[in-house]
Amino acid sequence: MDLTELLAFVVKNKASDLHLSSGLPPMIRVHGDVRRINVPAMEHKEVHGMIYDIMNDGQRKFYEENLECDFSFAVPNLARFRVNAFVQQRGAAAVMRTIPSKILSLEDLKCPKIFAEIADQPRGIVLVTGPTGSGKSTTLAAMVNHKNETEQGHILTIEDPIEFVHESKKCLINQREVGPHTLSFSNALRSALREDPDVILVGEMRDLETIRLALSGAETGHLVFGTLHTSSAAKTIDRIVDVFPAAEKEMIRAMISESIRAIISQTLLKTKDGTGRVAAHEIMIGTPAIRNLIRENKVAQMYSAIQTGRQLGMQTLDQNLQEMVARNLISSAEARGKAMNKDNFAGG
């Protein structure tokens, strides 16, 4: 099997990832589980050749010098793939994550109605958080697409690498990739504020400078979308504040409290019928009460504010999980694995 055939097999089987690892057969991740493909083990030379075929000269050089490399590429009429190539004990290896060529809408994803209202905000910061592989990019792409279909403005994305490719519909869209188009998130963000954007998407808020610039962008009248690898709204606020030195923490809390519009923390769970995965969300909206808690460093009280803010569109992860169990979408055991309070999901 050549790489194109393998990737076609991946897409056909609705797999999220293809794993190539010297000395082993290719493997795919389907609905969260890694499975072997029934083909012979691949030698180092074969895996190395496959990886090199889809790299450009700059990426090959980077891979040789750093022993790992992130990039994305497309197979025409199939899909785009986000790739991490690396070296392991048996030789060359790579993981290819499928990025569907069609951007799903908020309706396609069965997102809560409040997501469209969040995307409609004219300014502020909206964070989508969760572990790797929890569908953050897919949710954000749907929110950007909503903006693109309903408003006339300039959307600027800064990604590493570019995942979903957006067409300019009602909006002008410019997508920049760290590496080929800009040297860093912080460089691109600094320039972004002079590029007349209405919306800025920051693929990953990974360091102090990027976080500071994203907050400044939100403060100066732009809508900023960003992602973090945190599992709840409270942990997200703590994670942002913790990046800054003690002397700045109070100022950063004030900045977040002014600009935060929503934090959506999501996780994927296997459906009860075993045919796929479904997202569960904690949703925090930047209400006056929430902003106050952030400003006063009472983040621990945020959970109960979210719990009691249902009429405002808020929900805790456990509330969402309970609904999904009641609707027979997921099993109690699956919900218990992700729940904050496991006792709510006794039995199986």
Q: What are these model-derived regions, one by one?
A:
Residues 1-348:
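Short, flexible helix-loop junctions that flank or precede catalytic/ligand sites
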